[in-house]
Amino acid sequence: SLLGFALFLALGILWHRPMLALAGAGADRAVVDFHSHTNVSHDVRGTLMSKFDVRANLAWHRRAGFDAVFVTDHNTIAPATHADSLPVRCPGIEVSAWRAHIVLLGDTLPVDRDPYSRDWAGLTRLVQVSDSAYHSRSVASLPEYERNHWDRLDSLVAAGLDGFEIVNASPKANELSRTHRDSVIALARRAGRFVVGVSDHHGWGATSMVWNLVPVPSWRTTPAALCHRILARLDQGVGSVQVLERHRLRAESDWPSLLTPLGVVWETWRGMTGAVALSWLVWIWGIALVLDARGRRRRDIIPPPQSRTS
């Protein structure tokens, strides 16, 4: 039923169930997420994910197979948290600039967004000084740069922008078509900039859509230096990161907008291996059989109505 389908989607969003993890990256490549959030971000703090703190963020990324994660909260820095195991927490911040969100990767400390949120000059000023003032690499985040600055990406690059997101797992950022994605990659390649895929995770859901493989030889011998080495690698441009994206519903697909939830489920199934699809079927049919058995038992217990005689 439609209600059952809605409950299935809600459960998938809210339940931090076991998830698919990336494995087999090798000793000389780190699996990295370049954009994620905790409950110090305004759009996490006031939601059902209000308990999604740094530890919960790291635990989510650990289950997904990440070695390092940049915690990039909105216009603020999450408290320091000690962790003895992977993934390594890397520093960063997401600045709400003028009609754009710019992710700064590096130990920026807090950033006053006001001078950068007023106009185009403020936005370009942010990417100009991201290195000198904040010792960070600047990344244009989806969907804002596509929606608001598509015709002047060259100008952002000329001002000093270091990289672009080409995959963002946030539902609102899934509209980037393959054509636009390829245009961004071509621009980055010409200008010597890097491109990344990001979870932009806010605590919802339990399956990563994208991973980044960054070549960092023998990084496990000195994990404390991993964040610095990842940032240094980004300076080598497009070839510095290999983006791995799961099969999903694309913006240019033929699915009608009203059927988007159904299309998401269908395309998810299409991208599964046989073993994963079988696991889904076992769970679905197992739950259905349990519910059916309970219904039968209830019907057996209820006595038949007594006939009345005059």
For the regions a language model picked out, list residue spans one by one:
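A metal-dependent hydrolase metal-coordination microenvironment
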Residues: 15-139, 143, 148-152, 157-160, ...
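C-terminal functional module detector
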Residues: 1-24, 190-194, 199-310
